[in-house]
Amino acid sequence: MTEIKVPIAGVIGNPITHSRSPHLHRHWLHVYGIEGYYVPLHVQGQDLAEVFHALPKLGFKGVNVTLPFKERAIELADRVSDRAALIGAANTITFQPDGTIHADNTDGYGFIENLRNGAPGWSPRAAAIVVLGAGGAARGVLSALLEAGAPEVRLANRTRAKAEALRSDFGPRVTVVDWHGVSGTMEDAETLVNTTSLGMTGQPDLELNLDALPRSAVVTDIVYRPLMTPLLEQAVARGNPVVDGLGMLLFQAAPGFERWFGVRPEITPELRAAALAE
């Protein structure tokens, strides 16, 4: 009798109850009629290595990795993609048939695809891009923008030293500007990106003067709770096109689903609704 192996994937984090990934992948499994499972896994830090090596034996094809384990996932992998190595973090792990663990980072891909989908005609090559923040999310965004051909990225962070460290990692197309003077560097920018937590539910607002920003410039926020952050509301009020952060979450999930379940999923309004469902 032939044994049929049902594919399993999941998401690892601590805490994990906030993750929207199960909603996305279970929606796709239903839509494409795939018999498979996607489960949230609450893991303690000291158990991460053991869990990574146990999951393939339990039938797992791979996992997404969320906070606080994205950096450690790199260390536990046998092979690391170039972009994950540059970013220094992985969010997509694939357990290969030969027993090796492959680590990738699809956050930057999700960011770029979200902008291309949400702002038709947007191009990273058009003009300077202003990025706010220098944390882990900013690394993924910078990597993707430079790979996509951005001519200049102006980076501002409340702690300037962190921005300078990113500039050292990413090279001459990244310039560091003062956090308090960033508004004055926007007059020729065509994209403004917020990668900080400012404006997120429960966090202080991002207080930023957009008067110098061209009204043609696309404004995007990687935060998706709330969908319309104060920054996006301010941009809409002055006529700028805006792209919310939810699409980044949706698009970054697609490559992993394809690797684990064999189907390239579509990003649809129904998927957005599933992601927002409580």
UniProtKB/Swiss-Prot annotation:
> In its keyword annotation, does this UniProt entry include RNA-binding?
no
GO CC annotations?
cytosol
GO terms for biological process, alphabetical = amino acid biosynthetic process; aromatic amino acid family biosynthetic process; chorismate biosynthetic process; shikimate metabolic process
Query: Tell me, what is one Gene Ontology molecular-function annotation carried by this entry?
Result: shikimate 3-dehydrogenase (NADP+) activity
Q: Which residues bind shikimate?
A: 19-21, 66, 91, 107, 224
Query: Per its record, how is this protein called by name?
Result: Shikimate dehydrogenase (NADP(+))
Q: Which HAMAP family match?
A: Shikimate_DH_AroE
Q: Which SUPFAM superfamilies match?
A: Aminoacid dehydrogenase-like, N-terminal domain, NAD(P)-binding Rossmann-fold domains
User: Its Enzyme Commission number?
Assistant: 1.1.1.25
Which residues does the Swiss-Prot or TrEMBL record annotate as the active site? 70 (proton acceptor)
